[in-house]
Amino acid sequence: MQDAAAVRTGKTMAVLKKTELVKARKLWEEVFEEDTAKFLDYYETYVADHNQIFAEEEAGDVVSMVQLNPYRVHMGEAEADSYYIVAVATRESCRHQGRMRRLLAEALQQMYQEKIPFTFLMPASESIYLPFDFVTVYRQSLFTCGVVIPGSNDNCWHCIPCRWEQLKELAEWSNVFLQNHSEISTVRTEDYYKRIWKEQESMNGQILLFYEGSQMKGYCFTGYEGSGEAWEIAVEADNPEEQTGSEPRAASDSQALANRRAVEALTRWFGGQDQLPMRICGFLPESYIDGIPLSEMTYRPMTMVRIVNLEAFVSHMRAKKPVQFVLYIKDPIIPENCGVFCFELGRECSSL
């Protein structure tokens, strides 16, 4: 992996020194005006030092770029390398010239050579990435709350800012939680949360932990830039078999109640900071919030993914029972993925 930025000038590839990455920041500031200098300082220090930046340059200025941030991901019980694509940007005067397509194709080809199973991104618009065979896999729920929502004294949750020395415990808890609720998730480590800690600080926020009494029930990330916001709200539901009256509670109802308690705790926390109204987003997919009508919720495409190296991706697939089938694959960006393939999937291993 390169530790600097790859720059395309005409047909020539060059490698920028890290001290020259200020060129990429200049374009970032032009295109993403909503990002603060404080956030970009964080990004340069804790992210850009180990990512890859594909760019096109004119007259010494970066005019188009695609950045790849490396991540380890859980794929079932195994782990794999992946990249999060971020800061896809082109100077306004240089748009509609095929620059983004060239850079994305270049980045995808390099990831293919690295045997990356898949890559992912947060789209500004789905329509931008559909032609590159990205598909949306997660739509984030969000709503705005302007008042403190009271909770029951019997099961009231409260928020406590995470301490630096708790980050290892948080990593262990969140890995278990995410693997219980998803086949694919980013690997959480103490170092991962140290970086997240710095990111939240750059957005005037922090990592909050949810507690019921002395028991930790989950976490979320927060920020404040004119209004409060909380996201990635990961909270553990009570036992699905617990009773409500004479009927057993469904798992989805149990999760909805946990989400409700988290919302109550968040409104009390932000209300105490005089930061209401606040935006709350990012619960578990397909879960809802007890007592909050669906009509008050909106949804936005949050995560799009694309298979990069088909063989590597299939090697991580598993089937409850052995299965074999043939597919014709057409990939407009990565020709190595094109052809007729026999898929052989099993409980322990899979292959093409």
Which stretches of residues belong to each language-model region?
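Short amphipathic alpha-helix that is part of the acyltransferase structural core
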Residues: 2-70, 77-84, 151-191, 226-228
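Basic, Lys/Arg-rich alpha-helical nucleic-acid-recognition elements, primarily the DNA-binding modules
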Residues: 8-9, 48-51, 65-72, 76-98, ...
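Short hydrophobic/aromatic beta-strand element in the GNAT-like acyltransferase core
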Residues: 51-55, 65, 87, 205-209, ...
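Conserved GNAT acetyl-CoA-binding A-motif
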Residues: 104, 110-123, 272-286
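Conserved active-site alpha-helix within GNAT-family acetyltransferase domains
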Residues: 113-117, 123-141, 285-302
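Amide-forming acyltransferase catalytic core, primarily the GNAT-like/NAT-type
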Residues: 140-273, 304, 312-326
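Acidic, aliphatic-rich amphipathic alpha-helical segments
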Residues: 260-348
